[in-house]
């Protein structure tokens, strides 16, 4: 992909206030002091402020961060609203919100007096306001020519548009749609309308998640997100974070414009959240944390590890706690999981399906091909070891494994299997001198030999 910013502001990490770095472990006192000092120097007096923060699918020590922000804004801000950037995820319960933000469930006033905490409600059209549209010519420029005849209405949660200052607070990780998450992505798609969500995700899917994930700099989707964010009438700031996956440890924090703070943290995330291996594996077992409540969100266990799976290999998503494919996107069970080329080759049949659903489908199916004569051929097999019934799993074109038969220790002892005990945030890749994942690796071991679960892995790239 091009190194250009597609006509948008790329961000300059040297302009952001920064603490920490790759390999650094910041103390709570260091983090609190940095946050309070950064906010003290910002123009926030008598302002209506909207804090846009992640939901529980992102590792982030929010009680620590928000505590410091609350102290920094006390007696200064006119009003403060905390908006959970759910995107199209389901709403967080009062119990979950309390645990996530560090207050007694149902009583944010006790910990954050004067603040209001709100879920972003993507299912309610009245919560949105239109900021205008991105025209066809500009869309073509932003997407590198992938979208040449499409105008997009840019809608965002009214709480952001009506604020004087909108401040993003959240981590940066490798991301399958945009390259690296964070920054303006918390606005779009975090609290945006469906139009830009669908288009941005489909642009990413056209490029493919394998190509996009962990790509540094401004990708076409990042350019689209930055363009939409520039239309927000509120002043925009961001406190971007680099967090140790699955822990509360902070490696770095940056404050400034969303573009500058994101650029600073994306560079550090690339050194922190991308692990390079010396060899490919025939099988990966992704053990999913309980914060992923359905396959829609747990799909991260696939695409964060797909690059290290040999051609014809398998990714097993192990999540006994998951009982649904998607809570908020039931239509995914109608179309199933397929590669990009499956949809493009039959576009007339799928063009009216929400493009965000199509994009998600490709994310969990990975690389593959399709033609009328041979049908679909996928690079790797995808198997669910979850609480979802076998008939449902197979109906969406995925393989099934009874989670009760999964012996994590046995898999870990198998030299042909890579076990990730906390899947979903760290991206795994092969070292450049080893090669990529498109036909450059060979299957380690022989099909069906020494399977920890007694199965024969569906090698050769079938339909799963």
Can you name each region flagged by the protein language model?
Residues 25-28, 32, 374-464:
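Extended hydrophobic packing segments that form well-structured cores
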Residues 34-50, 73-77, 159-162, 232-233, ...:
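Glycine-rich phosphate/diphosphate-binding loops that line cofactor/substrate pockets in enzymes
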Residues 48-58, 81-87, 168-170, 284-288:
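Short glycine-rich or small-residue beta-strand-to-loop segments that form or flank ligand, phosphate
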Residues 2-32:
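N-terminal amphipathic/basic leader segments beginning at the initiator methionine
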Residues 115-276, 280:
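Conserved, well-structured core segments that form the ligand-binding/active-site neighborhood
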Residues 58-80, 298-309, 316:
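Histidine-anchored nucleotide/phosphate-binding helix
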Residues 78-88, 314-320, 383-385:
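Short internal beta-strands
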Residues 292-383:
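C-terminal catalytic subdomain
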């Amino acid at each position: 992909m091009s190194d250009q910013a597609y006509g948008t502001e790329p961000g300059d990490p040297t302009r952001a206030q920064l603490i920490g770095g790759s390999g650094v472990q910041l103390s709570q006192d260091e983090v609190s002091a940095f946050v309070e000092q950064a906010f003290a120097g910002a123009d926030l007096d008598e302002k209506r402020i909207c804090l846009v923060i992640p939901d529980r699918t992102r590792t982030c020590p929010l009680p620590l961060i928000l505590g410091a922000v609350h102290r920094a804004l006390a007696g200064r801000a006119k009003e403060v609203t905390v908006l959970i950037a759910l995107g199209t995820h389901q709403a967080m319960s009062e119990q979950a919100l309390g645990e996530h933000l560090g207050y007694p469930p149902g009583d944010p006033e006790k910990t954050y007096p004067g603040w209001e905490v709100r879920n972003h409600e993507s299912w309610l059209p009245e919560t949105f306001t239109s900021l205008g549209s991105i025209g066809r010519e500009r869309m073509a420029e932003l997407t590198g020519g992938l979208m040449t005849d499409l105008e997009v209405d840019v809608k965002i949660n009214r709480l952001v548009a009506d604020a004087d200052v909108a401040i993003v607070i959240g981590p940066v990780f490798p991301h399958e749609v945009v390259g690296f998450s964070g920054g303006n992505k918390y606005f779009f798609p975090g609290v945006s309308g469906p139009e830009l969500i669908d288009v941005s995700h489909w642009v990413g899917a056209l490029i493919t998640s394998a190509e996009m994930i962990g790509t540094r700099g401004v990708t076409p989707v990042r350019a689209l997100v930055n363009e939409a964010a520039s239309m927000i009438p509120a002043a925009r700031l961001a406190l971007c974070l680099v967090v140790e996956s699955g822990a509360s440890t902070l490696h770095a924090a940056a404050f400034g414009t969303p573009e500058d703070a994101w650029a600073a943290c994306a560079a550090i995330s690339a050194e922190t959240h991308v692990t390079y291996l010396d060899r490919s594996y025939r099988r990966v077992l992704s053990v999913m944390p309980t914060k992923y409540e359905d396959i829609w969100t747990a799909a991260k266990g696939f695409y964060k590890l797909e690059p290290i799976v040999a051609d014809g290999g398998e990714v097993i998503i192990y999540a006994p706690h998951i009982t649904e494919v998607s809570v908020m996107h039931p239509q995914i069970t109608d179309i199933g999981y397929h590669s990009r080329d499956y949809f493009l080759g039959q576009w007339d049949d799928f063009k009216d399906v929400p493009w965000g659903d199509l994009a998600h489908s490709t994310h969990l199916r990975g690389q593959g091909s399709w033609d009328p004569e041979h049908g679909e051929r996928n690079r790797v097999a995808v198997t669910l070891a979850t609480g979802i019934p076998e008939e449902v799993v197979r109906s969406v074109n995925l393989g099934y494994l009874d989670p009760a038969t999964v012996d994590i220790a046995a898999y870990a002892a198998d030299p042909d299997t890579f076990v990730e005990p906390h899947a979903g945030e760290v991206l795994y890749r092969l070292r450049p001198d080893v090669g990529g994942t498109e036909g450059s690796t060979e299957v380690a071991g022989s099909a069906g030999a020494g399977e920890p679960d007694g199965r024969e892995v569906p090698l050769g790239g079938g339909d799963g």
